[in-house]
């Protein structure tokens, strides 16, 4: 399926596709994304697509936007994948793309906040090696990019 998934940077012209994606999400999905039920406006979609104070990437399957991920200047990111396209690795691909973008931008840390019941996001965080902290009403995931590279290098190093 990964061959059919296209990850690309959003452009201002993508706002309608982003708006359609968010309007196709269930109330539960919107609650998990925003921590409360919120339906985005056209203006919200235009802001997401603008890349003004963040960078947004889209996941497309057969030309249809099925996922969106935004990375902010402080390293915090958000992610949403339409329910019908979960378990295909789209969320993981989007987060990996954000990690690479963060490295290119010189960020030392990427992080996310989610609700304890957002198991898909928690699974992605664990799979990619985020340090996870669980609180009563939220989960915090953090990856120090320089630390991750060091750990990968040490893990691949073999003593003579």
From Swiss-Prot:
<feature type="binding site">
    <location>
        <position position="79"/>
    </location>
    <ligand>
        <name>CoA</name>
    </ligand>
</feature>
<feature type="binding site">
    <location>
        <position position="127"/>
    </location>
    <ligand>
        <name>CoA</name>
    </ligand>
</feature>
<dbReference type="InterPro" id="IPR016181">
    <property type="entry name" value="Acyl_CoA_acyltransferase"/>
</dbReference>
<keyword id="KW-0808">Transferase</keyword>
<feature type="binding site">
    <location>
        <position position="92"/>
    </location>
    <ligand>
        <name>CoA</name>
    </ligand>
</feature>
<dbReference type="InterPro" id="IPR000182">
    <property type="entry name" value="GNAT_dom"/>
</dbReference>
<feature type="domain" description="N-acetyltransferase">
    <location>
        <begin position="5"/>
        <end position="148"/>
    </location>
</feature>
<comment type="function">
    <text>Modulates activity of albA1, the major archaeal DNA compaction protein, by decreasing albA1's nucleic acid binding affinity through acetylation of 'Lys-16'.</text>
</comment>
<feature type="binding site">
    <location>
        <position position="87"/>
    </location>
    <ligand>
        <name>CoA</name>
    </ligand>
</feature>
<protein>
    <recommendedName>
        <fullName>N-acetyltransferase Pat</fullName>
        <ecNumber>2.3.1.-</ecNumber>
    </recommendedName>
</protein>
<dbReference type="InterPro" id="IPR050276">
    <property type="entry name" value="MshD_Acetyltransferase"/>
</dbReference>
<feature type="binding site">
    <location>
        <position position="118"/>
    </location>
    <ligand>
        <name>CoA</name>
    </ligand>
</feature>
<dbReference type="GO" id="GO:0016747">
    <property type="term" value="F:acyltransferase activity, transferring groups other than amino-acyl groups"/>
</dbReference>
<feature type="binding site">
    <location>
        <position position="81"/>
    </location>
    <ligand>
        <name>CoA</name>
    </ligand>
</feature>
<feature type="binding site">
    <location>
        <position position="123"/>
    </location>
    <ligand>
        <name>CoA</name>
    </ligand>
</feature>
<feature type="binding site">
    <location>
        <position position="89"/>
    </location>
    <ligand>
        <name>CoA</name>
    </ligand>
</feature>
<keyword id="KW-0012">Acyltransferase</keyword>
<comment type="similarity">
    <text>Belongs to the acetyltransferase family. GNAT subfamily.</text>
</comment>
<dbReference type="Pfam" id="PF00583">
    <property type="entry name" value="Acetyltransf_1"/>
</dbReference>
<feature type="binding site">
    <location>
        <position position="91"/>
    </location>
    <ligand>
        <name>CoA</name>
    </ligand>
</feature>
